[in-house]
Amino acid sequence: MKSNYAVIVAAGKGKRMKMPINKQFICIQGKPILYYSISVFSKNPLVDKIVLVCAEDEIEYCKQEIVKKYNFDKVVKIVSGGKERQHSVFNALKVLENCSVVLIHDGARPFVTDRIIEDGIKYSNMYGACACGVVPKDTIKIKGKEGFSYKTLVRKELFIVQTPQCFDYNLIYDCHKKLANNKVQVTDDTTVAEYFGNMVYLYEGSYDNIKITTPEDLIIAENIFKTHKYI
Protein backbone atom coordinates (compact mmCIF):
# COMPACT_ATOMS: atom_id res chain seq x y z
CA MET A 1 0.00 0.00 0.00
CA LYS A 2 1.30 3.44 -0.93
CA SER A 3 2.02 6.09 1.71
CA ASN A 4 1.40 9.81 2.06
CA TYR A 5 4.66 11.60 2.82
CA ALA A 6 5.40 15.04 4.22
CA VAL A 7 8.69 16.59 3.13
CA ILE A 8 9.64 19.33 5.56
CA VAL A 9 12.31 21.65 4.21
CA ALA A 10 14.55 23.19 6.87
CA ALA A 11 17.83 23.64 5.02
CA GLY A 12 17.76 27.43 4.57
CA LYS A 13 20.27 29.66 6.34
CA GLY A 14 17.76 32.38 7.19
CA LYS A 15 20.10 35.35 6.65
CA ARG A 16 17.24 37.84 7.01
CA MET A 17 16.70 36.75 10.60
CA LYS A 18 20.15 38.14 11.55
CA MET A 19 20.60 35.63 14.37
CA PRO A 20 23.49 33.23 15.14
CA ILE A 21 21.31 30.12 14.70
CA ASN A 22 19.09 29.06 11.82
CA LYS A 23 15.53 30.33 12.06
CA GLN A 24 14.06 26.81 12.31
CA PHE A 25 15.87 26.29 15.62
CA ILE A 26 14.79 29.54 17.26
CA CYS A 27 12.54 28.76 20.22
CA ILE A 28 9.00 30.06 20.64
CA GLN A 29 7.23 29.22 23.88
CA GLY A 30 10.13 26.96 24.82
CA LYS A 31 10.30 24.80 21.69
CA PRO A 32 12.05 25.22 18.31
CA ILE A 33 9.98 26.49 15.40
CA LEU A 34 10.78 23.27 13.55
CA TYR A 35 9.21 21.24 16.37
CA TYR A 36 5.81 22.82 15.74
CA SER A 37 6.09 22.40 11.95
CA ILE A 38 6.84 18.68 12.28
CA SER A 39 4.38 18.08 15.11
CA VAL A 40 1.21 18.80 13.14
CA PHE A 41 2.17 16.37 10.37
CA SER A 42 3.36 13.82 12.91
CA LYS A 43 0.00 13.79 14.69
CA ASN A 44 -2.16 13.77 11.56
CA PRO A 45 -3.45 10.24 10.80
CA LEU A 46 -3.46 10.84 7.02
CA VAL A 47 0.30 11.48 6.96
CA ASP A 48 2.17 8.18 7.07
CA LYS A 49 5.82 9.21 6.91
CA ILE A 50 7.97 12.34 7.13
CA VAL A 51 11.30 13.16 5.49
CA LEU A 52 13.20 16.10 6.93
CA VAL A 53 15.62 18.18 4.84
CA CYS A 54 18.31 20.17 6.64
CA ALA A 55 21.81 21.50 6.08
CA GLU A 56 24.41 18.74 5.99
CA ASP A 57 26.21 20.07 9.06
CA GLU A 58 22.93 20.11 11.01
CA ILE A 59 21.73 16.56 10.29
CA GLU A 60 23.04 15.14 13.56
CA TYR A 61 21.62 18.08 15.53
CA CYS A 62 18.19 17.57 13.95
CA LYS A 63 18.36 13.86 14.62
CA GLN A 64 19.22 14.24 18.31
CA GLU A 65 17.62 17.55 19.33
CA ILE A 66 14.46 17.44 17.22
CA VAL A 67 13.55 13.93 16.06
CA LYS A 68 14.72 11.85 19.03
CA LYS A 69 14.08 14.46 21.71
CA TYR A 70 10.43 14.87 20.73
CA ASN A 71 9.83 11.25 19.66
CA PHE A 72 8.90 12.02 16.06
CA ASP A 73 8.60 8.38 15.01
CA LYS A 74 7.13 9.23 11.61
CA VAL A 75 10.41 10.87 10.54
CA VAL A 76 11.96 8.03 8.55
CA LYS A 77 14.84 9.91 6.94
CA ILE A 78 16.84 13.11 7.25
CA VAL A 79 18.52 14.22 4.01
CA SER A 80 20.93 17.05 3.30
CA GLY A 81 19.82 20.15 1.47
CA GLY A 82 21.18 21.37 -1.84
CA LYS A 83 22.44 24.68 -3.17
CA GLU A 84 18.93 26.05 -3.72
CA ARG A 85 15.51 25.08 -2.37
CA GLN A 86 14.62 23.16 -5.52
CA HIS A 87 17.72 20.98 -5.08
CA SER A 88 16.81 20.35 -1.44
CA VAL A 89 13.31 19.22 -2.38
CA PHE A 90 14.60 16.94 -5.14
CA ASN A 91 17.05 15.34 -2.70
CA ALA A 92 14.06 14.42 -0.54
CA LEU A 93 11.87 13.25 -3.41
CA LYS A 94 14.58 10.82 -4.51
CA VAL A 95 14.43 8.88 -1.22
CA LEU A 96 10.64 8.49 -0.93
CA GLU A 97 9.56 4.88 -1.25
CA ASN A 98 6.14 3.75 -2.50
CA CYS A 99 4.73 7.27 -2.22
CA SER A 100 1.22 8.29 -3.25
CA VAL A 101 0.88 11.95 -2.25
CA VAL A 102 3.73 14.18 -1.10
CA LEU A 103 3.14 17.35 0.92
CA ILE A 104 6.09 19.75 0.68
CA HIS A 105 6.20 22.17 3.60
CA ASP A 106 8.46 24.97 4.86
CA GLY A 107 10.07 24.13 8.19
CA ALA A 108 9.59 27.75 9.22
CA ARG A 109 5.76 27.57 8.96
CA PRO A 110 4.68 26.30 12.40
CA PHE A 111 0.98 27.21 12.12
CA VAL A 112 -0.18 24.73 9.48
CA THR A 113 -3.41 23.01 10.52
CA ASP A 114 -4.98 19.58 10.13
CA ARG A 115 -7.62 21.06 7.84
CA ILE A 116 -4.97 22.50 5.49
CA ILE A 117 -3.09 19.17 5.44
CA GLU A 118 -6.21 17.10 4.82
CA ASP A 119 -7.47 19.43 2.09
CA GLY A 120 -4.06 19.20 0.43
CA ILE A 121 -4.23 15.41 0.32
CA LYS A 122 -7.83 15.51 -0.95
CA TYR A 123 -7.12 17.98 -3.76
CA SER A 124 -3.89 16.21 -4.73
CA ASN A 125 -5.88 13.04 -5.27
CA MET A 126 -8.44 14.99 -7.30
CA TYR A 127 -6.18 17.24 -9.40
CA GLY A 128 -2.60 15.98 -9.07
CA ALA A 129 -1.21 19.29 -7.82
CA CYS A 130 -2.45 21.87 -5.33
CA ALA A 131 -1.31 24.54 -2.90
CA CYS A 132 -2.89 26.47 -0.07
CA GLY A 133 -2.80 30.24 0.25
CA VAL A 134 -4.73 33.42 0.88
CA VAL A 135 -6.02 36.45 -0.99
CA PRO A 136 -3.84 39.52 -0.26
CA LYS A 137 -5.31 42.09 2.10
CA ASP A 138 -3.42 44.98 0.52
CA THR A 139 -3.71 46.52 -2.93
CA ILE A 140 -0.91 45.19 -5.16
CA LYS A 141 0.76 47.39 -7.77
CA ILE A 142 3.46 46.76 -10.37
CA LYS A 143 6.33 49.19 -9.93
CA GLY A 144 8.23 50.44 -12.97
CA LYS A 145 12.00 50.85 -13.27
CA GLU A 146 11.80 54.57 -12.51
CA GLY A 147 9.89 53.99 -9.29
CA PHE A 148 6.38 54.83 -10.47
CA SER A 149 3.34 52.58 -10.33
CA TYR A 150 2.15 51.67 -13.79
CA LYS A 151 -0.47 49.03 -13.06
CA THR A 152 -2.81 48.06 -10.23
CA LEU A 153 -3.68 44.38 -10.09
CA VAL A 154 -7.16 43.06 -9.30
CA ARG A 155 -6.86 41.87 -5.71
CA LYS A 156 -9.55 39.18 -5.87
CA GLU A 157 -7.64 37.50 -8.72
CA LEU A 158 -4.40 37.32 -6.72
CA PHE A 159 -3.28 34.55 -4.38
CA ILE A 160 -0.43 34.47 -1.87
CA VAL A 161 0.80 30.89 -2.06
CA GLN A 162 1.81 29.14 1.15
CA THR A 163 2.81 25.59 2.03
CA PRO A 164 2.16 22.71 2.13
CA GLN A 165 2.20 22.35 -1.62
CA CYS A 166 0.85 18.91 -2.40
CA PHE A 167 1.29 16.62 -5.38
CA ASP A 168 0.85 13.24 -6.88
CA TYR A 169 4.33 11.87 -6.23
CA ASN A 170 5.07 10.72 -9.78
CA LEU A 171 3.98 14.07 -11.20
CA ILE A 172 6.23 16.24 -9.03
CA TYR A 173 9.16 13.80 -9.08
CA ASP A 174 9.17 13.75 -12.88
CA CYS A 175 8.97 17.56 -13.00
CA HIS A 176 11.88 17.99 -10.59
CA LYS A 177 13.92 15.41 -12.49
CA LYS A 178 13.41 17.33 -15.74
CA LEU A 179 14.17 20.62 -14.00
CA ALA A 180 17.48 19.24 -12.71
CA ASN A 181 18.64 19.07 -16.33
CA ASN A 182 17.79 22.74 -16.92
CA LYS A 183 19.29 25.91 -15.51
CA VAL A 184 15.93 27.33 -14.45
CA GLN A 185 15.65 28.65 -10.89
CA VAL A 186 12.31 28.52 -9.11
CA THR A 187 11.17 29.64 -5.67
CA ASP A 188 8.51 27.02 -4.99
CA ASP A 189 7.21 23.67 -6.17
CA THR A 190 4.03 24.91 -7.83
CA THR A 191 6.28 26.75 -10.28
CA VAL A 192 8.12 23.50 -11.00
CA ALA A 193 4.83 21.78 -11.83
CA GLU A 194 3.58 24.72 -13.91
CA TYR A 195 6.85 24.95 -15.85
CA PHE A 196 6.07 21.59 -17.40
CA GLY A 197 2.45 22.40 -18.21
CA ASN A 198 0.62 21.13 -15.13
CA MET A 199 -2.35 22.96 -13.62
CA VAL A 200 -2.17 23.66 -9.87
CA TYR A 201 -5.39 23.88 -7.86
CA LEU A 202 -5.37 26.66 -5.25
CA TYR A 203 -7.30 26.18 -2.04
CA GLU A 204 -7.87 28.15 1.16
CA GLY A 205 -4.93 28.36 3.56
CA SER A 206 -4.80 30.61 6.60
CA TYR A 207 -3.53 34.10 7.38
CA ASP A 208 -1.95 32.53 10.48
CA ASN A 209 0.09 30.15 8.31
CA ILE A 210 3.02 32.55 8.10
CA LYS A 211 6.61 31.77 7.19
CA ILE A 212 8.88 33.04 9.94
CA THR A 213 11.65 34.85 8.09
CA THR A 214 12.43 38.13 9.87
CA PRO A 215 12.64 39.34 13.49
CA GLU A 216 9.27 41.02 12.99
CA ASP A 217 7.75 37.64 12.09
CA LEU A 218 8.90 36.29 15.45
CA ILE A 219 6.83 38.94 17.23
CA ILE A 220 3.79 38.05 15.11
CA ALA A 221 4.35 34.34 15.79
CA GLU A 222 4.50 34.87 19.55
CA ASN A 223 1.16 36.68 19.38
CA ILE A 224 -0.41 33.92 17.28
CA PHE A 225 0.68 31.34 19.86
CA LYS A 226 -0.78 33.34 22.72
CA THR A 227 -4.03 34.17 20.94
CA HIS A 228 -4.82 30.79 19.42
CA LYS A 229 -3.10 28.51 21.95
CA TYR A 230 -1.08 26.47 19.46
CA ILE A 231 1.14 25.19 22.28
From Swiss-Prot:
A GO BP entry: isopentenyl diphosphate biosynthetic process, methylerythritol 4-phosphate pathway
Pathway: Isoprenoid biosynthesis; isopentenyl diphosphate biosynthesis via DXP pathway; isopentenyl diphosphate from 1-deoxy-D-xylulose 5-phosphate: step 2/6
Keywords assigned by UniProt, alphabetized: Isoprene biosynthesis, Nucleotidyltransferase, Transferase
Keyword Protein transport belongs to the record: no
Domain of life: Bacteria
Reactions this protein catalyses: 2-C-methyl-D-erythritol 4-phosphate + CTP + H(+) = 4-CDP-2-C-methyl-D-erythritol + diphosphate
Family listed: Belongs to the IspD/TarI cytidylyltransferase family. IspD subfamily.
Name of the protein in question: 2-C-methyl-D-erythritol 4-phosphate cytidylyltransferase
Organism: Clostridium kluyveri (strain ATCC 8527 / DSM 555 / NBRC 12016 / NCIMB 10680 / K1)
